[in-house]
């Protein structure tokens, strides 16, 4: 692990104009989905959950928010934005593999968001998935504004720390561009915003038209193997990682999953269980809880915004280079040099004078969240960083 501290001298713009967007939902627009209860027997952390309807009011236009906290007065409040197909619901209930519980047990209150995707059932009819055509990054950032307003109302804080993993990191940067005055700091968990070496500009209208021609508005995490086969593999590993594999090439089902994840995005890119960085059983518990579908249009948004310093027709990067907000970045090396450089570039050029980089050597993407050393190499530094900047 390498940790680098860097100051970037940037001048904050004299006036930051508020985004012309709809006002966040009022506190009474949220409904309690689960009253406060312990997350697990013997845990000092409790959970409360809420849901809120979002426009235009379709069957899946609902977001959720989970609060994780221990007893006593929190030292800080953090809003957590999950990665693609992830949610704010607990997949892992041990703090050694869950940043939210680690922070909450130490006095940092965590609000974790459920995107609209969490309301979409795995067996949703294909025609119902067309609702995702309007679930672009701007729509999700508006949902984040609503969740942030609720977190501020519940916590009594004017500013929140905002953390995001993977695509959640992209959305954290985007949200900070929209409401910088409400962000105390960004905890970026293995995700970029702007490319350090941009390729050609992406024509968003043409890309969306091409997507519309396919009619495939939702990406399916089940991939070529299918959703049920994916889920069956995860459940088998959770039940007994030393049980028999469905593929004769492996001695155990745990070894089978380890190899699938080791090679999914290239050697050690998605995760590095064969290198001992993560445990297949822990990874299975994380992955089995994924939401099946995610809006494909957001892949286009990511390409459009990353390719230019100020992408046209979006306000999600309008303050890029002028974000005078502390940034803490953790980035894996398993996804290659371009990934590392793009993540570093995004953090360094956001506009902050207070940027800390942590390069996690030998880690894959998911290992940043649930690796066997994540508690000491990610969670503890994140706790110390937030604590030092809490007001």
Map each language-model feature to its residues.
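Alpha/beta-hydrolase fold nucleophile elbow
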Residues: 155-166
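Alpha/beta-hydrolase
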Residues: 203-326, 330-335
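Catalytic active-site module of serine/aspartate enzymes centered on a nucleophile-bearing elbow/loop
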Residues: 354-391
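Short, surface-exposed "cap/lid" segments of acyl-processing enzymes
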Residues: 71-118
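N-terminal cap/lid segment of alpha/beta-hydrolase-fold proteins
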Residues: 30-72
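Conserved loop-alpha-helix segment in the C-terminal half of the alpha/beta-hydrolase fold
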Residues: 331-360
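Alpha/beta-hydrolase active-site loop
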Residues: 130-153
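Conserved hydrolase catalytic core segment
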Residues: 167-170, 174-197
